[in-house]
């Protein structure tokens, strides 16, 4: 059964609803069209523009999902087993063809051990624990394990007081104290070793859990293939400049889209500040490594290398109390970045990749070069008068960029002729332009993240390089400001972003010197996307 929503051609079907599907339901992703012709079916995605030939099973499922359907309804309509339908639908979701609603809760909620490592954060830890006492989750299915990593503040007395308080409730609070400081990774391992339940939830002591935190993440484990899941991390206090910046620009913020974590995908790890793991998987991997920084990245990479699966579900939200003084902000950024060298030593195959596909790279270089030339000549004309011929020459790279854009468009048109479907020129042109512009952002982000300080130093000796740096930063800051929607004006956002990049690059260099490993500064160049 399908509804009567059609566009132009009666053989072209697509979903017209934009709200999220209901829990346990699947629906055709917005911007996806199904074209039925001569007994075959094609799916057309607007962004990124692609045409995919469908096998009969996928075609039937997608057609049914023009209206919201559950796995049970799809299984009944297709005659397939429910588990096979669920697997197939999940694959279509990861490919961007279907959209899934929130998972249905399990018949009975599984028990969870929450592990919180802490060092000298008595006030923050108390706030964190009270948020856990208010979770919308059966208290009888929870145990909270605090690992005090040899704190010297009021942590001990505060925990004794809370232990007496929860003793009168149906809640479990266990405290384990290290006699000497051993680090956050080892502290997480200590807590997991003491855990009595099959699911271990890691939470940092300076975080506050939302009431529905576990209810949103735990249902993911109904899929036995999932070894770990993480949720969204937002800023606890967004009323400060750095707090509002960290809210959407922190390395802990993974976006608002449900994703599958993959070593080759856009999301390669989950922060351990908000992560649930099957205890048997933690045991198999021998826990977290004894690293001062980057232990969560290392754990995720080892988990993925073992063949296990990991998902990111942004609905499971916690709030992180970021350090909002400038010195602390810069030091933390540099410390995070310094882990890159250690991670490369442990995972030599996970090198940073710089994509340089010829067409996209030529387009980006032409646009950036053209803007650089015009900016430089405009500045010079202020002092030496207008130079028409020089401006005309500076416009040449922009003309070359336009020619490359047209070349890429007609190249796509030729590819589309292999399919029995006509896609209008404006759609293909727009998709090509969007892809080229996205690559220009990718290239600019790569250069500003790792080479801002270097370009600043070089610009003292070669001033035109400073114009290039301004253009690269302008591209990145402009795109990110629109994409992330931070709660601040663009001027303050630009300042925070520049300080962020400088601190990060300094941290990478410091880590390279510390570990005598320079590969983080030298990417692997690939010419194929």
Question: What positions do the PLM features span?
Answer:
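Short, flexible, basic/aromatic active-site loop/helix in glycosyltransferases
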Residues: 231, 247-267
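Short aromatic/hydrophobic "clamp" motif used to bind/position activated sugar donors
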Residues: 200
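N-proximal low-complexity "stem/linker" segments adjacent to membrane-targeting elements
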Residues: 47-56, 61, 79-131
């Amino acid at each position: 059964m399908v509804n009567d929503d059609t566009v132009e051609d009666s053989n072209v079907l697509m979903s017209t609803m934009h709200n999220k599907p209901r829990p346990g339901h699947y629906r055709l992703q917005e911007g996806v069209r199904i074209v039925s012709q001569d007994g075959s079916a094609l799916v057309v995605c607007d962004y990124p523009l692609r045409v995919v030939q469908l096998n009969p099973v996928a075609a039937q499922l997608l057609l049914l999902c023009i209206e919201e359907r559950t796995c049970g309804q799809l299984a009944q309509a297709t005659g397939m087993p429910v588990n096979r339908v669920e697997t197939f639908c999940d694959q279509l979701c990861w490919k961007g063809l279907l959209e899934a609603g929130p998972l249905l809760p399990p018949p009975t909620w599984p028990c969870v051990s929450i592990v919180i490592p802490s060092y000298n954060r008595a006030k923050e830890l108390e706030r964190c624990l009270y948020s856990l006492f208010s979770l919308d989750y059966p208290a009888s299915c929870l145990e909270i394990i605090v690992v005090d990593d040899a704190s010297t503040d009021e942590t001990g007395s505060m925990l004794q007081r809370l232990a007496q308080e929860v003793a009168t409730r149906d809640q479990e609070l266990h405290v384990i104290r290290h006699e000497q400081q051993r680090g956050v990774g080892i502290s997480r391992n200590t807590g997991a070793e003491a855990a009595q339940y099959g699911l271990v939830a890691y939470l940092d002591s300076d975080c506050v859990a939302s009431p529905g935190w576990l209810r949103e993440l735990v249902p993911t484990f109904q899929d036995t293939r999932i070894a770990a899941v993480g949720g969204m991390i937002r800023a606890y206090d967004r009323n400060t400049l750095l707090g509002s910046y960290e809210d959407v620009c922190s390395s802990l913020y993974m976006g608002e889209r449900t994703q599958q974590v993959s070593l080759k995908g856009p999301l390669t790890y989950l922060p351990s500040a908000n992560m649930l793991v099957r205890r048997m998987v933690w045991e198999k991997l021998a826990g977290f490594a004894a690293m001062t920084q980057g232990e969560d990245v290392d754990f995720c990479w080892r988990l993925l290398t073992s063949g296990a699966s990991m998902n990111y579900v942004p609905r499971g939200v916690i709030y992180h109390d970021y350090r909002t003084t400038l010195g602390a902000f810069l030091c933390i950024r540099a410390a995070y970045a310094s882990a890159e060298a250690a991670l490369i030593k442990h995972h030599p195959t996970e090198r940073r990749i710089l994509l340089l596909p010829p067409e996209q790279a030529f387009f980006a270089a032409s646009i950036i070069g053209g803007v650089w030339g015009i900016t430089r000549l405009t500045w010079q004309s202020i002092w030496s008068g207008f130079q028409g011929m020089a401006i005309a020459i500076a416009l040449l790279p922009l003309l070359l960029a336009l020619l490359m854009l047209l070349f890429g468009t007609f190249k796509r048109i030729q590819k589309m002729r292999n399919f029995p479907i006509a896609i209008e020129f404006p759609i293909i042109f727009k998709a090509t332009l969007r892809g080229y512009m996205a690559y220009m952002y990718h290239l600019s982000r790569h250069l500003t993240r790792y080479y801002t300080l270097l370009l600043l130093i070089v610009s003292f000796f070669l001033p035109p390089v400073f114009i290039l740096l301004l253009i690269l930063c302008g591209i990145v800051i402009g795109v990110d400001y629109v994409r992330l929607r931070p709660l601040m004006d663009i001027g303050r956002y630009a300042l925070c972003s520049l300080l962020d990049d400088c601190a990060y690059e300094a941290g990478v260099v410091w880590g390279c010197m510390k570990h005598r490993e320079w590969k983080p500064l030298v990417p692997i160049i690939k010419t194929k996307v």
